[in-house]
């Protein structure tokens, strides 16, 4: 099967972030990285549950914390938890595209749906200067991040536009070109950072992410060297022979 077909079989579409709940550890890492604190008004878009709001209020003492999600069951359950624990967070059930986030100082935004991202981009561009938007894995489309602690990325208003996809990619990885070691390092950071109970084989997912990172870099012309590294070739063969997961066609597309 093609790699895209395999990704669709993963629990909660794990690799893309769709409907995945961040761990408490991840929230704390993100909040420390973005320097969340008492003056801040924090929004978690697509919150899914109350956990990020609870930690923002109880541990980081934010001025205000709001979670928004369009799943009524999840929002209702999250509200009940906050009420039971007497935590003054706000939880709103609506589509984030329709939400008023104009007072935000820090926003957590982890979506992969292009239509949602593109609609929100216009909304973000109208936010007040210095507002921080945290994304995971990559920055906002066509933008250069303000700060990176991979896989966590801070985008700051006003957004800085990238001159090219290559410039954007290199701003994330901090290297002039992406080799196997770089791809593996960042894939491992991602897998460990978003670790959930569904991840039973970190190494397996790290291999998949490594191949995705390197092949994307190759397509963008920022992979180190012209030849495919031996390690990449080995893992591509391993995926095909042992798991019937095909990456080779992606390289063929690149060479056309």
Go through each PLM region and give its residues.
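S-adenosyl-L-methionine
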Residues: 1-37
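Conserved class I S-adenosyl-L-methionine
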Residues: 39-48
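Conserved SAM-binding loop of SAM-dependent methyltransferases across substrates and taxa
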Residues: 51-62
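Conserved SAM/SAH-binding beta-strand->alpha-helix loop
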Residues: 71
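Conserved SAM-binding loop
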Residues: 78-79
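Conserved SAM-binding strand-loop segment of SAM-dependent methyltransferases
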Residues: 85-96
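C-terminal substrate-binding/active-site "lid" region of AdoMet-derived donor-dependent transferases
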Residues: 115-173
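Charged, amphipathic alpha-helical linkers/stalks
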Residues: 156-206
């Amino acid at each position: 099967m093609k790699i895209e077909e395999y990704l669709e079989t993963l629990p909660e579409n794990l690799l893309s972030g769709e409907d995945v709940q961040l761990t408490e550890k991840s929230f704390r890492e993100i909040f420390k990285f973005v320097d969340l604190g008492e003056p801040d008004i924090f929004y978690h878009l697509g919150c899914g549950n109350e956990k990020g709001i609870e930690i923002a209020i109880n541990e980081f003492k934010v001025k205000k914390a709001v979670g928004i999600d369009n799943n009524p069951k999840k929002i209702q359950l999250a509200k009940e938890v906050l009420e039971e624990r007497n935590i003054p967070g706000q939880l709103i059930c609506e589509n984030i595209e329709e939400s008023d986030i104009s007072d935000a100082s820090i926003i957590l935004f982890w979506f992969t749906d292009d239509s949602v991202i593109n609609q929100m981009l216009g909304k973000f561009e109208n936010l007040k200067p210095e507002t921080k938007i945290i994304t995971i894995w990559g920055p906002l489309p066509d933008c250069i991040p303000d700060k990176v602690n991979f896989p966590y990325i801070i985008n700051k208003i006003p957004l800085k536009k990238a001159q090219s996809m290559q410039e954007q990619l290199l701003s994330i990885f901090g290297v002039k070109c992406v080799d196997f070691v770089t791809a593996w390092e960042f894939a491992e950071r991602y897998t460990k950072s978003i670790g959930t109970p569904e991840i039973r084989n970190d190494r397996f997912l790290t291999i998949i992410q490594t191949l995705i990172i390197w092949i994307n870099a190759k397509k963008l012309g920022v992979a180190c060297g012209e030849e495919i590294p031996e390690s990449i070739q080995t893992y591509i063969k391993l995926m095909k022979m042992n798991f019937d997961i095909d990456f080779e066609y992606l390289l063929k597309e690149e060479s056309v």
